[in-house]
Amino acid sequence: LILMAVALPLAFSVWSALLNNFVVEVIRFDGLDIGVLHTIREIPGFLAVGVISILLFVREQTLALSMLALLGIATAVTAWFPFLSGILTITLLSSVGFHFFETVNQSLQLQWFSKEEAPNKLGKLMAYGSAATLIAYIFIILGWEKLNLSFNSAYMLAGLSCFAIAVIGYIIFPNFKAAVPQTKKMVIRKRYWLYYLLQFLSGARRQIFVVFAGFMMVERFGMDVQQLTTLYLINLILNIALAVLLERAVARFGERNALAVEY
């Protein structure tokens, strides 16, 4: 789980940090193009429910590592497709790897940890992921000019690192048997309607910002790779620093009040 927690942000953080500069500087995207790209990218997320049918034939751990490998390969070859149809196709493939992996990975985490140890263990996994993202951003900022990195070399390094970790996980670690058998069917509860609604609103808000904020910084304000990645790094550091305060706020005022303030 630690390996998978590190591998995903290594590939995805580099992909997302470089994407806007790549599509503007190399492919000459406009606002419509970037909207189409992210629309294509969200299709596998919507279809991630199909993972349930795949699990009838493939173990969750095997599927998770396979999707992680797919994400790594797609990230590695992103710069090989500097045209609209190519970048849309490779984005679709990387999105399949990302969303299907995320779906299965969350399931594995909850299966392999007991209720007592889950909060602590999940927190540690998130910390490993944040550390990997931090390293990826710093590497881009410091190495873009000093190491004469290009879009292709950066994507290749990040993608192949992710792919290598997936292969290592597949070869070295055996298939762990979950203590609780996984239910291979969709479960929807009427009493969870508010959770479903909040997830929908959160996703919509996040996508609107993710799609256009970074793109605008590059297209309208001319930010280069290092400047935009520095913004991402500052945001990450602030999130890490404020996480403790937010945790205390939730503990003091309750989840409902905290969510009400957020939304």
What are these regions (language model features)?
Residues A17-D33, V211-L231:
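Short amphipathic helix-loop junctions that connect adjacent transmembrane helices
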Residues N120-F139:
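Glycine-rich segments within core transmembrane alpha-helices of 12-TM secondary carriers
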Residues L47-E60, W144, L242-E255:
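Helix-to-loop junctions at the C-terminal end of transmembrane segments
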Residues L63-A76, N257-Y263:
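Structural signature of the two symmetry-related core transmembrane helices
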Residues L19, F100-F113:
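Intracellular juxtamembrane helix-capping segments at the cytosolic ends
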Residues I140-W144, G159-A178:
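C-terminal membrane-cytosol helix-exit motif in multi-pass small-molecule transporters
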Residues A79-I90:
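Helix-loop junctions at membrane interfaces in 12-TM secondary transporters
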Residues E25-V26, V49-F57, L134-A154, G214-F215, ...:
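Transmembrane alpha-helix termini and helix-breaking/packing motifs in multi-pass membrane transporters
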